[in-house]
C-alpha cells in the first residue's frame, strides 16, 4: 500500500476506499502489522488482588497468548505451556507458581520451569526452551504496555507525559463495575474513525453536546496517535488543572487519547476509561472498557458521566455505516479540513 493513497494535504485528500472496511485481504494485511506496535496490557491496580492476569486481547493484536505476573516486579510471559502447548492460565488468580492444568508442568512467576511430573530419564531436560518466553513490557504511570518486539510509535508515551503526566494515574483504582465488553457488526477501523472526530457530537450525542463547548473542541496530532480536547461549558464539570499543566486556566472536560491501532485513553475528572478496539473479523469488532477511578465524587458528572449511553449511540452509527460502505454506490468521500484531521491522520497510518 502506498501512503499516497491518502493525500497528505487534507484539502485534496479522499477518504479510505471502502475495501479497507469490507475486504478480507486488506483486513488481514492491516492487522498483521499490529504486532509491530505496543499495546495496552493492564493498569497495575488490576494486579493488586490477583498476581496472575491472562491477556486474552493480545492474541488478536500480536498473535500470541500472554499473561502478566506480579512478584518482585511485573513480567509479561507467554501463556503457552512448553510441554504440549496448553494455555497455562485462563483466568485471573493469585498463585505462587504457574501450573499447567493439562499435565502439571510448573513454572515460577518469572517464567522459569520448576517441575514436570513423569519426566525422569529425559535427556537434556530441562533447558532454557522449557521456560516460558518473556515479552517486552513497558510501564508508564501505572499503565503497562506489552509487545512482541514492538518497533512502531515507541515515543507516544512522551506525548502523554507532557500533557497528563501531572495526574496521579498510578494511584487510580480499578473498578470492575465499570468493565464492559461489546461485539458490533462493523469493521474495527470504522469504530476508530468515529472516535477520532467530534464533528458528529451535535447530531448523535445530544446529552454530551450539552456538556461540551463544540466550537472550542480541538484535535491535536502526533506520531502514532491523536489527542482530542473537550472543553466544558461554564456550568459543567472540568479538571482542576495545576499550574504545571500546559492547559492551565482552561475548562478541560476530557482528554481523549487514541494510540495506534486501537487504544483509547479517556481522561475525565473522575479518572480514566480505557477502551480497546479489538478486530475479530473484517466485519466484526469487540470493544472492551476498563474503568480506573481517581475521584468517586465526580462519577456520573460531566463529559464522562454516562459512557454507556454515548457508546450505544456510537455503535448504532458505526454499524449503519458498515452497511453503507458495503454498497456499490459508495467508495470514497472527502474530509472536513476543520473537523476531521484526526481521521485523516489515522487513514494515512493505515495506508502506509
Place the predicted regions along the sequence by residue:
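Short Pro/Gly-enriched beta-strand edge/turn motifs at strand-loop
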Residues: 37-41, 48-51, 116-121, 256-261
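Generic structural signal for secondary-structure transition and capping sites
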Residues: 35-39, 86, 200
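C-terminal catalytic domain of Rieske-type non-heme iron oxygenases
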Residues: 67-71, 78-79, 138, 143-352
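Short, contiguous pre-domain boundary segments
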Residues: 2-19, 171-172
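Rieske [2Fe-2S] iron-sulfur-binding domain
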Residues: 47-150, 158-161
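Short clusters of hydrophobic/aromatic residues that line enzyme substrate/ligand-binding pockets
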Residues: 41, 88, 113, 208, ...
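Short linear motifs in intrinsically disordered
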Residues: 43-49, 126-127, 253-256, 290
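Non-catalytic accessory segments flanking enzyme active sites
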Residues: 20-61
Amino acid at each position: 500500500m502506498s501512503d499516497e493513497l491518502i493525500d497528505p494535504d487534507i484539502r485534496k485528500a479522499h477518504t479510505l476506499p471502502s475495501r479497507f472496511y469490507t475486504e478480507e485481504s486488506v483486513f488481514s494485511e492491516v492487522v498483521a502489522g499490529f504486532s509491530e506496535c505496543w499495546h495496552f496490557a493492564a493498569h497495575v491496580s488490576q494486579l493488586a488482588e490477583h498476581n496472575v492476569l491472562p491477556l486474552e486481547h493480545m492474541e488478536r493484536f500480536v498473535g500470541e497468548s500472554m499473561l502478566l505476573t506480579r512478584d518482585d516486579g511485573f513480567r509479561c510471559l507467554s501463556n503457552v505451556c512448553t510441554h504440549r502447548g496448553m494455555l497455562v492460565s485462563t483466568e485471573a488468580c493469585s498463585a505462587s507458581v504457574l501450573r499447567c492444568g493439562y499435565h502439571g508442568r510448573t513454572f515460577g512467576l518469572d517464567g522459569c520451569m520448576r517441575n514436570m511430573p513423569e519426566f525422569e530419564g529425559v535427556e537434556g531436560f530441562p533447558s532454557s526452551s522449557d521456560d516460558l518466553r518473556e515479552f517486552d513490557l513497558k510501564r508508564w504511570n501505572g499503565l503497562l504496555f506489552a509487545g512482541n518486539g514492538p518497533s512502531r510509535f515507541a515515543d507516544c508515551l512522551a506525548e502523554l507525559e507532557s500533557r497528563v503526566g501531572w495526574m496521579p494515574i498510578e494511584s487510580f483504582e480499578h473498578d470492575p463495575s465499570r468493565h464492559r465488553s461489546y461485539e458490533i457488526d462493523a469493521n474495527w477501523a470504522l469504530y476508530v474513525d468515529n472516535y477520532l472526530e467530534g464533528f458528529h457530537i451535535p447530531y448523535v450525542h445530544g446529552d454530551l453536546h450539552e456538556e461540551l463547548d463544540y466550537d472550542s473542541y480541538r484535535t491535536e496530532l502526533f506520531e502514532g496517535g491523536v489527542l482530542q480536547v473537550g472543553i466544558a461549558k461554564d456550568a459543567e464539570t472540568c479538571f482542576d488543572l495545576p499550574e504545571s499543566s500546559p492547559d492551565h486556566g482552561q475548562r478541560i472536560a476530557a482528554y481523549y487519547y487514541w494510540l495506534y491501532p486501537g487504544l483509547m485513553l479517556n481522561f475525565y475528572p473522575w479518572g480514566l476509561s480505557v477502551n480497546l478496539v479489538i478486530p475479530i473479523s473484517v466485519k466484526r469488532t469487540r470493544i472492551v472498557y476498563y474503568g480506573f477511578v481517581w475521584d468517586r465524587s465526580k462519577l456520573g458528572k460531566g463529559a464522562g458521566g454516562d459512557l454507556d449511553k454515548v457508546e450505544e449511540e456510537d455503535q448504532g452509527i458505526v454499524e449503519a455505516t458498515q452497511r453503507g460502505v458495503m454498497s456499490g454506490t459508495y467508495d470514497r468521500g472527502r474530509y472536513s479540513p476543520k473537523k476531521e484531521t484526526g481521521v485523516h491522520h489515522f487513514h494515512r497510518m493505515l495506508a502506509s
